[in-house]
Amino acid sequence: MRDITRNISNGILNKLQGLNVVVIDERGEISSSYRGVMQNDLGIRTDVINDIQKSIGMKIAIRSMAPQVLIADEIGSEDDSEAIKYAMCCGVKGVFSAHGNSLEDVMKNPELKGLIQDKIFEKIIIIKSRHGSNYEIETMNIN
């Protein structure tokens, strides 16, 4: 999530212009903020809202910070789902993570299932751990 955030925020030379990003970091796992200062490099156009419920943080960001992209990890509650739908209706893009061993596992959560079935997401990336530090990455376009 940190690398994705930094690349969206800074941009990628000749490929992607940097965008205004707000990270909703409910438990400080992405930014590792200490006394309000990010300890991880999340990019030059990144603001962080931490120590607040994700759904509330998303709405605060949209109303007062003009993000082009919201980033949050471990989504899955009804409040998260409603906030994500609100963000998309406001034209804000998002990068979100959810835990599960497979798409079928993630779809057991009714809120995530609803977001996927409603085609709120353009793309789903599944990262499966394979023996130690090896990973298998599967990408699925939704729309």
Q: What does each model-identified segment do?
A:
Residues 1-2, 32, 78-80:
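Short glycine/serine/threonine-rich phosphate/pyrophosphate-binding segments
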Residues 4, 24-27, 51, 74, ...:
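Fold-independent oxyanion-binding glycine-rich loops
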Residues 65-67, 71-124, 129:
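Conserved P-loop NTPase nucleotide-binding/switch module
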Residues 122-143:
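Conserved P-loop NTPase
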Residues 30-33, 104-107, 133-136:
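Switch/connector loops and helix/strand junctions flanking conserved nucleotide-binding motifs
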Residues 5, 58-59, 81-84:
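Generic hydrophobic/aromatic pocket-lining and core-packing "Φ" positions
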Residues 1-12:
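Glycine-rich phosphate-binding P-loop
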Residues 12-61:
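P-loop NTPase switch/communication element
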